[in-house]
Curated annotation (Swiss-Prot):
The keyword Secreted applies. It comes from the Eukaryota. It comes from Pithecopus azureus (Orange-legged monkey tree frog). Belongs to the frog skin active peptide (FSAP) family. Hyposin subfamily. The keyword Secreted applies. Keywords: Secreted. This is Hyposin-H3. It is found in: Secreted. One of its GO terms (cellular component) is extracellular region. Its main location: secreted. Expressed by the skin glands.
Length: 15
């Protein structure tokens, strides 16, 4: 789990 999850679902609040 890394940038792939963030790119699909930006629930981390990262741009």
């Amino acid at each position: 789990l890394g940038p792939a999850l963030i790119t699909r679902k930006p629930l981390k609040g990262k741009p």
